């Protein structure tokens, strides 16, 4: 089969941000997505790409940007839509928040959005779909030529653990500490067409693989392929779907800057005739697990021999490499948030710090709500990175 790719302008951006609807008093999720969307028809109407959309659960609303040239445009677009949504939510006693999972609520208590697509998904996947009470962020980055797409997807898979660890925000599942930095990656990754992208050779191999899945009845549309990093032919982008739910617009800007800078780097290298790195599938899968379990304290595999380095060190090196590109793109300050997170802690660390200092899970929910309203992480004595020896530690991560 032939799959048309609509080329983008170089490194344009689009972001999808899945938000939790939280009751202001109880901290539990509210099943009011349909009511809020009906209250804001100008933002959720019949146009093909409205900025507010349903997700699987009635406790979730997705905020979507238009096509943006810069990270600043992404943040402005998201903030404007969130401001309108916040107004409507305030009138119903609802707060907005974002994390990969809700720390307390159980998937069994959720209502599903009224959608034929979601009904078919639940019928097909059953328990796997019913328990997807998860929240993520997807970043689209434009690619100029279809023949560049698969090499860029393969190269980006080297940084899959970096994307996940920086945004890991789901240590709790149904009121319990899972011991993971990201339980969301396990829950969503259980779907048969989710997980790390397969290592393909070129666009023709991607077309052949999609044709095989369609012929086999595994999927009915290529939109049902939910890889952690995937081509999006209609939008002319590479879509990075590995990010856990991101609590603040400042950190969303970081994710967009990191994504845009990497894709721009790989485009430039391809233009100069370089061959991009393409790690083996076993390395990508193993590294994803390490980031899922240990977050920023993981040791990641860097070659086929199994050599490992601390993920934190690799991130600092990556920042140094990407800095000139980020400056040209105008997103250097957003990229610098990576260093801030390495200093004060990713969301999973900030959440656990609250419990470690005597708080309860309702306090974690309240902190997520406050961070979302502030637009930036709460940094202070009650937050910060955990001691690696207390959450698995690099020595175990590299075993």
Curated annotation (Swiss-Prot):
Name under which the protein is recorded: Putative glutamate--cysteine ligase 2
Superkingdom of the source species: Bacteria
HAMAP family associated with the record: Glu_cys_ligase_2 (MF_01609)
The keyword ATP-binding belongs to this UniProt entry's keyword annotation: yes
Catalytic function, reaction form: L-cysteine + L-glutamate + ATP = gamma-L-glutamyl-L-cysteine + ADP + phosphate + H(+)
Classification via Gene3D superfamilies: 3.30.590.20
Entry's Gene Ontology BP terms: modified amino acid biosynthetic process
Molecular-function GO terms, alphabetical: ATP binding; glutamate-cysteine ligase activity
Record family assignment: Belongs to the glutamate--cysteine ligase type 2 family. YbdK subfamily.
Keyword Nucleotide-binding carried by entry: yes
NCBIfam families: gshA_cyan_rel, PRK13517.1-2, PRK13517.1-3
Region (Disordered): 377-399
Organism of provenance: Thermobifida fusca (strain YX)
């Amino acid at each position: 089969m032939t799959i048309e790719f609509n080329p983008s302008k170089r490194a344009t951006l689009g972001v999808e941000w899945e938000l939790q609807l939280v009751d202001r008093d109880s901290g539990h999720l509210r099943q009011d997505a349909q009511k809020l969307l009906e209250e804001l028809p100008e933002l959720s109407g019949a146009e093909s790409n409205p900025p507010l959309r349903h997700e699987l659960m009635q406790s979730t609303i997705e905020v979507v940007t238009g096509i943006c040239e810069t990270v600043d445009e992404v943040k402005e677009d998201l903030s404007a839509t969130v401001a309108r949504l916040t107004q409507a939510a305030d009138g119903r006693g609802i707060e907005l928040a974002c994390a990969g999972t809700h720390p307390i609520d159980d998937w069994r208590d959720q209502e599903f959005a009224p959608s034929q697509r979601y009904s078919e998904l639940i019928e097909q996947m059953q328990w796997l779909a019913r328990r997807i009470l998860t929240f993520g962020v997807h970043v689209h980055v434009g690619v100029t030529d279809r023949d560049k797409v698969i090499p860029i997807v393969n190269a980006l898979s080297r940084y899959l653990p970096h994307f996940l660890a920086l945004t890991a925000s789901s240590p709790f599942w149904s009121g319990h500490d899972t011991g993971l930095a990201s339980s969301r990656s396990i829950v969503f990754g259980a779907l048969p067409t989710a997980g790390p992208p397969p290592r393909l050779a070129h666009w023709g191999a991607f077309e052949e693989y999609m044709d095989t899945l369609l012929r086999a009845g595994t999927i009915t549309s290529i939109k049902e392929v939910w890889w952690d990093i995937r081509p999006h032919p209609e939008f002319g982008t590479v879509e990075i779907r590995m990010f856990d739910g991101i609590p603040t617009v400042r950190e969303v800007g970081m994710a967009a800057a990191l994504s845009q800078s990497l894709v721009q780097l790989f485009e430039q290298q391809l233009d100069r005739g370089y061959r991009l790195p393409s790690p083996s599938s076993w390395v990508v899968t193993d590294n994803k697990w390490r980031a899922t379990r240990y977050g920023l304290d993981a040791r990641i595999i860097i070659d086929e021999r199994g050599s490992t380095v601390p993920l934190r060190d690799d991130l600092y090196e990556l920042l140094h490499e990407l800095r000139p590109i980020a400056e040209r793109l105008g997103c250097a300050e957003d990229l610098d948030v990576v260093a801030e997170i390495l200093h004060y802690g990713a969301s999973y660390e900030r959440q656990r710090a609250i419990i470690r200092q005597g708080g309860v899970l309702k306090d974690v929910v309240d902190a997520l709500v406050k961070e979302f309203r502030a637009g930036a992480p709460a940094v202070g004595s009650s937050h910060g990175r955990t001691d690696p020896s207390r959450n698995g530690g690099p020595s175990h991560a590299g075993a």
